[in-house]
């Protein structure tokens, strides 16, 4: 019987699948036999939650012919007994590049300098990161080794895309079988359109930031839907983009914040994305749930952190350690919140880690049926392929794998995988060799011999009735066994050579004796030798230490978001910035996020009373020029104008500098684009609502602003050879950039008015807003001639420059600035840090103020922003500005420059309760902010901060010690990796 079974299996493995008549010629006789097989009496997981016992599966011509009990065996059909096996539908990976790695990016022929345009031959898009015309199926070639690895982890189908660029082209749905030609493995040629926020491998200068990538993607959408083309240009990329609009869109992002950014783009164009996320969605689960968009999540959970040095506490952040503990809980949290998701193997160091990581997710709360659904039915549904894959049902591809136990039993092993009906034995799985005592029998010998076999055996001894009969050499590896008997060691001269493999508990195989006679043999397990320590480890449930999510997910975050309170400050010195001036021994009441009133001897039922005797209360500090809380680049310097990019697209609510600046009394900031080009990007106005999501930091109904720049930075004087080919290269050229764009902006306004359906140009849209007084300029500036030039350009085109920032030669042209109506946001005492500021003086702010220009002091620096109160004090030192007026330099005046003074900047009933409690005169170097409120919510408290610092150290120590124990217990670990902190300035460029 065993000979017949073994022969049947051998024949089965030699057959090929016949789907249809092939156009490819044969090299030798063709095998016309159909690949038909019956799997009997298995436990079949037809679909997640639908388990059928003692069930048969009939496979014909690569598809499932029938599923049920006692199915009649067709003539000539092979039959396999699976009575002790579990069968699962093959997994589907929706984010893979399997088989399409032969695609190559454009090789640049350009020498030094910036690469401004695509070098791809043909009528394609101007930017190499945009290649929707790429079809992954044209590059697909099956890879035997990788396919075997994927099958070994349960994957029978992948959706393969070119993982390079912003618009990556169409993805192809393929099976992980092995056939020639590879086209026979293609299930569906064009299934989805791949997108991302990463420019990929191109060395083209634009985009150089994530906000640039987002702007480029948005512009591509508008190019695709334009009803009237601006020229008769033939563009194959845009044509392909329009074709791809009928496909599913899969966008790859790298954090939960980027998920929200992707959703923002999708909503703008009425699209639904499938978002390949980063596995950190638990950090803001409510916001992710509100997007109502499906996810593809990785399970590349970080290894536990192993710490050998107490100094490691200073090298690693609390959020890093917390992520290690919480990442395995992410799939379960998503499932419990009803968020639709599928799971990808992307991001794993090795594919063989997949099942281990999946079981870890199950241990940490992911329901088993939900886990299976995330790998079968959900991905099939998301790409509209439920008729072909995802379950074990009649008519679908015969894609399923066989386990010797329930998949979620940690001791379970996969024995085989059927892909499009073809059976693949698995040779790359963890060895399931049985160590133990066996009985050896053959078809040509009636005797049964006792033998001990282990993986470490080098010799084999066959014992009959306690007497050594045969001995020889043996090798056991990956469930395969080979042994031969040495004639010299044989007592009767017999020579046997045997090969076989493990099937369940026993070994079966074929052999040949010294006479050339073939036979079958069996090694029947009598007694298994078990490694108890290994089994105990497999059975043990190792859970990550419990820890809580913080908002934001950094060390100084809160477990719960704070709320607005009714607070009465008693007996304080109030700096009103109003006609009342500075009031001593005065009370102030805030409630519902607003200033209610101030006066003497106030009382209010239910109010929290704070004794502010000897202390000062002011409106919050406003930083007119900041670069904190920005993700992935502050400059988009690849072109002379980047008016299309928006800082608001990349606001980073997790930046610890928000908290640090709250500790310095800052409550609002203008987040500015850098100064890499004459026309920069659009600003974002935020309040420092520590812990709020990015969109909730934004100040609603704030006017739009945009960054312009003059001087050394924009003409790239310090960029070296890399910056010698982008226009402009001189100060004269900078003026011509403005002349060009404003004249084009005027024409654009007229054309759009005449033809509202013409192509929308995001760059010129922003320029048009400036000309229509809907967007306002903040201009980086130093030298008086350039300052005067931009005001003249503005006068010519009938708009007003809103603010000159830095403006270190403003004292030279203060009268002209006042006449133009422009404000100044300057440094208090910066000079001599580059040549174009050679004439800077610390009296600059006072001189402009005395002439009548609205003057503010800004930071342009994450550290200086925490000391803007001291910067204001320097206006008193340099120029004798009265204290009350000097304080306005960092409160009311920046509010005026940002058009926010109706809501903030002073203590006035009805204004936002953005207030700071200071320990001393706020202009003093001894003053510290004791409490900072934004919209009446206390986001910083110096006394509570001391407690937080101690709590952070204790929590880091607790988690590290717990992980040290897990590492000692055998769990994979890695050393401490310090997190790099990036601080942006005007001239910062992403690497």
Segments and roles (model prediction):
Residues 22-24, 29-36, 44, 48-90, ...:
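Histidine-rich, glycine-flanked metal-binding segment
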Residues 30-37, 73, 426-439, 452-455, ...:
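N-terminal helix-cap/turn-to-beta initiation motif at the start of protein domains
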Residues 33, 41, 111-122, 133, ...:
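His/Asp/Glu-enriched, well-ordered alpha-helical/loop segment
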Residues 39-43, 428-452, 457-466, 474, ...:
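Tryptophan-anchored aromatic micro-motifs
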Residues 42, 397-430, 572, 912-952:
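C-terminal cap of metal-dependent C-N hydrolases
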Residues 95, 441-450, 480-553:
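Beta-sheet ligand-binding and adhesion/scaffold domains
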Residues 142-280, 413, 419, 431, ...:
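Polyanionic/metal-chelating signatures
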